[in-house]
Amino acid sequence: MFNFEVISSCSNTEARTGIFHTPHGQVRTPRFMPVGTLATVKGISSQQLKSTGSEMILSNTFHLHLQPGEKLIKEAGGIHEFMNWDKPVLTDSGGYQVFSLAKLNNITNEGVEFKNPRDGSPVFLSPDKVMRIQMDLGSDIAMAFDHCPPHTATENDIQDSLNRTHLWLENCVETHKKSNQALFGIVQGGRYPKLREISAKFTSSFGLPGIAVGGVSVGESVEQIHNVINFVPKFLPKDKPRYLMGIGSLKEITLAIAKGFDLFDCVLPTRLGRHGTAFFNDERWNIRNARFKNDFSPIDKTCKCETCKSYSRAYLHHLVRNDEILGLTLISLHNIAHLLRFTNAISAAIKDNCFTIDFAPWKRSSIAHHTW
């Protein structure tokens, strides 16, 4: 039911293209996943999302548990029926909230007690409970519960969090018995190569359908992010999809693909879109700026997304300057389509054996320009 095929490999780098088979269809890799925390990519319908070429989205177990609750979603027929999305869904475990809500939680080896950010009521999550929530949600991929420490943590604290993550993975594997849902483990270890190596080898030992690398892009320097991207893949199995969590910039995605990563997610395209910022090649344009007021060209004349096919920069400028929701939706749609177009171009370049670490297909001088 879950199978990963490597289709082509790059002779210049560790990059590869592949297909991950799930009960709700195929995911072609390398692939960016839009983030739909509450079973919605903010401001975008499922039909609009399909128009961008999205093949899998990410939702969040912690937030869906709080509202509307996994039992209601199960009653609706699972997350796919609930949100009218017939393609694959990955649910994050809530491990990131262990990091982001650190001031509101208490962590032990048994689990994490949170204060509900909505009303302050106590919420307890354990590995067993997180697995049961995700089984009720009915996602295609369930992430193991992990402890994501802050990037400023000491080596001893990161070692403790790593031990806890490994203990929780064992508990998750023991609980997770759903054959039509894949369980992915998560590699932690902070900025310490030895801890990352230990975690990668431990997580790989379970033979799970896929492996993620977490604790990246949580406030550390770009150099530290690159160190993890460069170092960890050598300890991961080559026959499983590799998911680098929380990465959405073109530079980091390019490096990660070159090192053999396959899946990525980030809130960046929609968060920036909601603030009126659009992607163009490797630039970010604030559409609110006056220079777009009388510009009747699309954001990108080479882009085939619904926004670029139908609307001008001037119209989008008008919408965002007047805080019209449609403007933020249209820019978010373009940004998602742009990232997916970028990973599609990388896939084509890998197949044509012209992918390099400085991949920039929008440049006419690029050997991979034909992929753009």
From Swiss-Prot:
The keyword Electron transport does not apply. GO terms for biological process: queuosine biosynthetic process; tRNA wobble guanine modification; tRNA-guanine transglycosylation. Keywords: Glycosyltransferase, Metal-binding, Queuosine biosynthesis, Transferase, tRNA processing, Zinc. Residues 246-252, 270-274 are annotated as: RNA binding. It is an enzyme of class 2 (transferase). Its cofactor is Zn(2+). GO terms for cellular component: cytosol. Zn(2+) binds at residues 303, 305, 308, 334. InterPro entries: ArchSynthase1/Queuine_TRR (IPR050076), TGT (IPR004803), TGT-like_sf (IPR036511), tRNA_ribo_trans-like (IPR002616). Binds 1 zinc ion per subunit. Pfam families: TGT. The active site is at 92 (proton acceptor), 265 (nucleophile). Substrate binds at residues 92-96, 146, 188, 215. GO terms for molecular function: metal ion binding; tRNA-guanosine(34) queuine transglycosylase activity. It catalyses: 7-aminomethyl-7-carbaguanine + guanosine(34) in tRNA = 7-aminomethyl-7-carbaguanosine(34) in tRNA + guanine. Pathway: tRNA modification; tRNA-queuosine biosynthesis. Signal peptide: none annotated. Its EC number is 2.4.2.29. Belongs to the queuine tRNA-ribosyltransferase family. Homodimer. Within each dimer, one monomer is responsible for RNA recognition and catalysis, while the other monomer binds to the replacement base PreQ1. HAMAP family: Q_tRNA_Tgt. Catalyzes the base-exchange of a guanine (G) residue with the queuine precursor 7-aminomethyl-7-deazaguanine (PreQ1) at position 34 (anticodon wobble position) in tRNAs with GU(N) anticodons (tRNA-Asp, -Asn, -His and -Tyr). Catalysis occurs through a double-displacement mechanism. The nucleophile active site attacks the C1' of nucleotide 34 to detach the guanine base from the RNA, forming a covalent enzyme-RNA intermediate. The proton acceptor active site deprotonates the incoming PreQ1, allowing a nucleophilic attack on the C1' of the ribose to form the product. This is Queuine tRNA-ribosyltransferase. It comes from Prochlorococcus marinus (strain MIT 9515). The gene is tgt.
